[in-house]
Regions:
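C-terminal motif of bacterial Sec signal peptides marking the signal peptidase cleavage site
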Residues: 16-19
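Structured soluble/peripheral alpha/beta segments that form catalytic or ligand/cofactor-binding pockets
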Residues: 22-370
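Bacterial N-terminal signal peptides that target proteins for export
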Residues: 1-9
Length: 370
């Protein structure tokens, strides 16, 4: 089961809470609430399910590939997390207001640079009508409705304001938009694998009009996953033939691969699920990169084969250092980066772009209660 970023958001929001406490006082050992019983999944409904849900964890994730009017290329990822107390679904009247964490990364391919920033906030954000209507995390905003998604993220030297229009229907991962694992809980999960995007990028003293393609993921549920050596590799690939590929490889608490699965989405939006253990997907890591910031060794370069689809591609980062270290503790650090794709499909050349997410490679420091 793919439970991307659950540890990241919990670590980030835990960090926010610890920052507000007196550091001279001991931090009590947390009393984790048990996961809720796994319910029977219900059919997703839009626009209602674009908006927030009363579950332990939820996020809206975007990664994109942009060009300015001069042809210069950029990659970005923008994600907002919502965390609720599972015992009362974030009832602020009982002192359990929802917590929010947001992260933004920008890769400037011409300058071979990667910038990043984070924001945190807490408190109820009432929604009027279906969808997600201007969720705020400090000075960043996000809105999501079936016909239009938008966000605004600003840092000291970068501002990206985007409008994104879906060009395909929602892709329900695992065919029904729901996955469950034996020990880690359950999650609803759908993607909008190709959105037409346009907006404004302010980079230093330059203001640039940008456009391109975006991948969006939305997940919510009752789940949790441990950090190093547990973790995952996730791939969101957009091919130039109009199809998309999602791949997830998860590792258990012993660092062993326990699942490899994904989906192939046709140009018309038809989704073909690739189930764990089916033998329909082969993922091989080639090479590694060691972070000068954390000492973590990340995979760097992959070969993917889908024999039934006669698809074979190589995936390579466009910039090696796309590690996200703007949050602490170390369990919240991960690699999220823009990649280039080259290969063949049915004997014909195919290229593409994508984003890869790598978690569980940084050995965390002991937490305050240890």
């Amino acid at each position: 089961m793919r439970t991307r970023l659950s540890l990241i958001v919990l670590s980030a929001i835990t960090l926010l809470a610890l920052a507000c406490t007196n550091t001279d006082r001991s931090v009590p050992v947390p009393d984790p609430a048990p996961l809720a019983p796994t319910p029977a999944p219900v059919a997703l409904s839009f626009p209602q399910d674009e908006g927030p849900h009363d579950n332990r964890l939820e996020w809206w994730y975007y990664s994109g590939h942009l060009q300015d009017e001069a042809g210069d290329e950029y990659g970005f990822h923008f994600v907002v997390f919502q965390s609720l107390d599972s015992s009362d679904s974030g009832d602020s009247e009982n002192g359990q207001a929802p917590g929010y964490a947001a992260q933004f990364g920008l890769t400037d391919m011409g300058a071979n640079e990667h910038r990043q920033a984070s924001r945190f906030s807490s408190g109820e954000q009432p929604q009027v009508g279906p969808g997600l209507n201007e969720l705020r995390v400090a000075d960043w905003t996000l809105s999501a409705n079936p016909d239009l998604h938008s966000f605004d993220a600003v840092t000291d030297d970068v501002r990206l304001t985007m409008s994104m229009t879906p060009t395909k229907p929602p892709a329900l991962q695992n065919d029904i938009g729901w996955l469950a694992g034996p020990t880690t809980g359950w999650t609803y999960y759908y993607s909008r694998p190709r959105m037409a995007a346009e907006g404004t990028l302010e980079l230093g003293d330059r203001q640039l009009s940008v456009s391109g393609d975006v991948w969006m993921d939305h997940q919510w549920g009752e789940f949790f996953i441990l950090g190093n050596p547990a973790g995952w590799q996730w791939f969101g690939i957009q091919l130039d033939d109009g199809s998309e590929l999602m791949i997830t490889e998860t590792r258990n608490v012993d660092g062993e691969i326990d699942a490899l699965y994904g989906s192939l989405i046709a140009p018309d939006g038809t989704l073909t699920s690739i189930q764990p253990g089916s033998g329909e997907l082969d993922l091989v890591t080639e090479g590694s990169w060691t972070s000068p910031h954390t000492g973590a060794e990340y995979p760097n370069g992959w070969i993917v084969k889908l024999p039934a689809s006669k698809l074979e591609i190589r995936i390579d980062p466009v910039v090696a250092d796309q590690e996200i270290i703007s949050t602490r503790p170390e369990s919240a650090i991960y690699w999220e980066g823009k990649v280039a794709v080259n290969g063949t499909r049915d004997g014909n050349p195919v290229t593409g772009e994508g984003f890869v997410e790598l978690t569980g490679y940084v050995v965390p420091d002991p937490l305050p209660w240890r």
